Amino acid sequence: MNLHEYQGKQLFAEYGLPVSTGFAVDTPEAAAEACDKIGGNEWVVKAQVHAGGRGKSGGVKLVRSKEDAKAFAQQWLGKRLVTYQTDANGQPVTKILVESCTDIAKELYLGAVVDRSSRRIVFMASTEGGVDIEKIAHDTPEKILKATIDPLVGAQPFQGRELAFQLGLEGKQVAQFAKIFVGLAKLFKDHDLALLEVNPLVIKADGDLHCLDAKINIDANAMYRQPKLKTFHDPSQDDPREAHAAKFELNYVALEGNIGCMVNGAGLAMGTMDIVNLHGGKPANFLDVGGGATKERVTEAFKIILSDSNVAAVLVNIFGGIVRCDMIAEGIIGAVKEVGVKIPVVVRLEGNNAELGAKVLAESGLNIIAATSLTDAAQQVVKAAEGK
């Protein structure tokens, strides 16, 4: 689950980290009032969406009057912001963050992720702040500094000081960086985060360090342990198909291809997507119906897949283990009839009662293409999607 910038900064403040004074507002009038509360004569207004690249798309602006802040809120509230990290429809803007202006001398980067290879939280820092860190890691990986956190003892101040020296920080900045480093590490662990970024972490004109941005992603599997963070969820930022799928305990992720995929098991689903790609196709989604693939869930899965107008064919790949393939076949037939599927459907069944399942499909009288193997299924669905 992603958090908005203002929510991330709220958590930063709770851990004693330096952030700008700001208010998240949902009306133009409140934006003007926020300027009065903050004081001064310059403010930064930011559209709140779960995507980067807001500045380049006009979603971040420096304003010098309450009227300009109000006008910015009027411009964006209720609209959709399109950035390089969103699809063509963009993300809806329901909140504007109004905060004090910061005089920046230099921009740095500080972030943390769970590194699967070392099974540790790893912090990354760079002197190249304010830009896409993935690009820096690709073009100049030597500019990425790393510190691995030992789970038994946690983040240590000396690790923060080492990074600070490598970043070229001096004097009071070293202690400030170490405090931010340890605070972020505690925040990461306490709230089961999957990713945390401060981009940029800035050196102000007076030499102090300041967290100018906050990007936080929480491990969805740990949300049951984070009741407070559940209240931070903004459903307006969710893909409507993914949100609908979650109601039926279907794991769905929308992609940009034209071949719908329905599979039981996350690993098999990823393998199915890979083999579709291998044979020249483009998956329209990841969809794992899980072990209990009932007719109702298969029906909902079809509805979700077909709600994507780009889908030209559907591949159903089921491995029968606890669930029998003949039961799955009956569910597919019922779903195809109920939903009224008009595009080609390729089905590959393997495992428990696979032959009986194939027979049920063949006798259904429906235009369902039975595949003999996963390779055959991928080839068939790619041809079907191309109209061949």
Curated annotation (Swiss-Prot):
PANTHER family: SUCCINATE--COA LIGASE [GDP-FORMING] SUBUNIT BETA, MITOCHONDRIAL, SUCCINYL-COA SYNTHETASE BETA CHAIN
Organism of this sequence: Pseudomonas fluorescens (strain Pf0-1)
Keywords assigned: ATP-binding, Ligase, Magnesium, Metal-binding, Nucleotide-binding, Tricarboxylic acid cycle
Catalyzed reaction equations: succinate + ATP + CoA = succinyl-CoA + ADP + phosphate; GTP + succinate + CoA = succinyl-CoA + GDP + phosphate
The protein, known as: Succinate--CoA ligase [ADP-forming] subunit beta
Listed pathway(s): Carbohydrate metabolism; tricarboxylic acid cycle; succinate from succinyl-CoA (ligase route): step 1/1
Cofactor detail note: Binds 1 Mg(2+) ion per subunit.
GO CC terms: cytosol; succinate-CoA ligase complex
Limits of the ATP-grasp domain: 9-244
EC number: 6.2.1.5
Family: Belongs to the succinate/malate CoA ligase beta subunit family.
Cofactor(s) the protein requires to work: Mg(2+)
GO terms assigned for molecular function: ATP binding; magnesium ion binding; succinate-CoA ligase (ADP-forming) activity; succinate-CoA ligase (GDP-forming) activity
Cited InterPro entries: ATP-grasp, ATP-grasp_succ-CoA_synth-type, ATP_grasp_subdomain_1, Succ-CoA_synthase_bsu_CS, SUCC_ACL_C, Succ_CoA_ligase-like_bsu, Succinyl-CoA_synth-like
Gene3D superfamilies the record matches: ATP-grasp fold, A domain, ATP-grasp fold, B domain, Succinyl-CoA synthetase domains
Any one GO BP annotation for this protein: tricarboxylic acid cycle
UniProt: substrate binding residues: 264, 321-323
Residues annotated as binding ATP: 46, 53-55, 99, 102, 107
Subunit structure: Heterotetramer of two alpha and two beta subunits.
Nucleotide-binding found in the keyword field: yes
Entry binding sites for Mg(2+): 199, 213
